[in-house]
Amino acid sequence: MKNKQSGREFPNRRISGRKPRPEQTKREGTDMEKENIFHRLARQYSKSSLILRILFGMAAGAILGLLIPSASFLSIPGTLFVSALKAIAPILVFVLVISSLANGQTKFDQRFGFVIFEYLFSTFMAAMVAVAFSFLFPVSMALKDAAQVDAVPSGIGEVLENLLVGMFTNPVSAIAGGNYISILFWAVVFGVLMKKLAGEGTRTFFNDLSEILSRTVKGIINLAPFGILGLMYQSISTTGLSIFRDYGLLILLLAGTMLAVALAVNPLIVFLILRRNPYPLIFRCIRESGITAFFTRSSAANIPVNMRLCERLGLDKDMYSVSIPLGATINMDGAAVVITIMTLATTRTLGIRIDLASAVLLSVMSTLAACGTSGVAGGSLLLIPMACSLFGVPADITMQVVGVGFIISVIQDSMETALNSSGDVIFTATAEYRHWKKTGKSLPTFLKGDTKLDI
């Protein structure tokens, strides 16, 4: 055989591959079979209902927490799940808002104003319901030790001042620290300017980056059952059931009030706006947002979950990419309930009589204070002393109340976050569907409309 370039001749050689050994062929076949089984299981896992997987994780975590409370390594998936959500949420919000403003036709139309109205009105109504329940089912507390906490805001002015000053934090520091008021402020500024000044390449980059982050969030949420298992295990193994024995009535009052807000007040608001049966929307939001928020105990960590749910509800991305992180900051029904009930329980314990006018004033203060809980370390609990100051409660007593709050926080904070976070989606969807009705677009099928959604 001649080489075409050199013209030199080489003897013909018969090229033959070495036959694989039987055991090698068998091993490779087994590996491929295992890989195929793994892929099939992964696909089957992803196709199954996320809610059923989460419920299974809850049950498994509770059982393991009761049976083997010393196996602390079982809580690691929960820690990793919450950390992953908290890590990606700030940059997700920042990029999505910029991308929506720079690439879309986003205008801060009446939908945004209406969402803010819904957030504030529902928070005020939650505080009023808390007043009513506190009068109907009065509860006292056994005060023991004062809580060791950082500086408490001296008044509503300081809370609002901290909230506004926080807007002008360095944007990099805001993303690193999860300061969503500042993140939203800078994202809106950058997005508006980018729409006017940036080239097509820059806009495309942010659009692609938002898609990458959204896909990442989808993957994290897909692993939620393992995270919920770890979080449930940690709660049961650490606290057990003794908390219900010592503070059962207070927990029942808080839980009952929050359930009343979630299952009566919020549905009533949705019904008055849409004139449709609100419960299909309410239950979807509680099931797909509230359950996850209950275990993460962080509205910020639940932002990616809520954005994914808004996408499945067919909402405008330009709308929910702003309203959801805004809701995580100012939509605080649960916080208003906690501040109001804990304050009225304190006054009852001390024998201080509260008239109706004072209770309404407390509701207004609780509403304004609740909107500032995202800017206070410790959230709603550290705003209790400020509310108690309305009635002249001594500082050492209020710190004992805060201490009780921290003891029951495993239940209180979980339900508070679930109520707050599910409400973000409920009221965003309500404002969007109201806009659909006004513009002649049919509502989703679960609200007796004709628009079919993949949900």
Model-identified regions with their sequence ranges:
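Short, Lys/Arg-rich, polar N-terminal cytosolic tail immediately upstream
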Residues: 31-46
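Signature of multi-pass transmembrane helix bundles
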Residues: 42-67, 79-88, 110-280, 441-446, ...
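Membrane-water interface of transmembrane alpha-helices in multipass transporters/channels
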Residues: 73, 109, 241-249, 276-284, ...
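Hydrophobic transmembrane alpha-helical segments of multi-pass transport and channel proteins
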Residues: 84, 120-124, 128, 255-260, ...
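Juxtamembrane helix-boundary/capping and inter-helix hinge elements in multi-pass membrane proteins
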Residues: 101-110, 196-200, 239, 275-278, ...
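Membrane-interface alpha-helices at helix entry/exit sites of multi-pass transporters
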Residues: 109-115, 219-222, 312-328, 357, ...
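Helix-loop-helix junctions within the multi-pass membrane cores of secondary transporters/permeases
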Residues: 288-370, 442, 446, 450
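Transmembrane alpha-helical segments and their short flanking loops
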Residues: 341-455
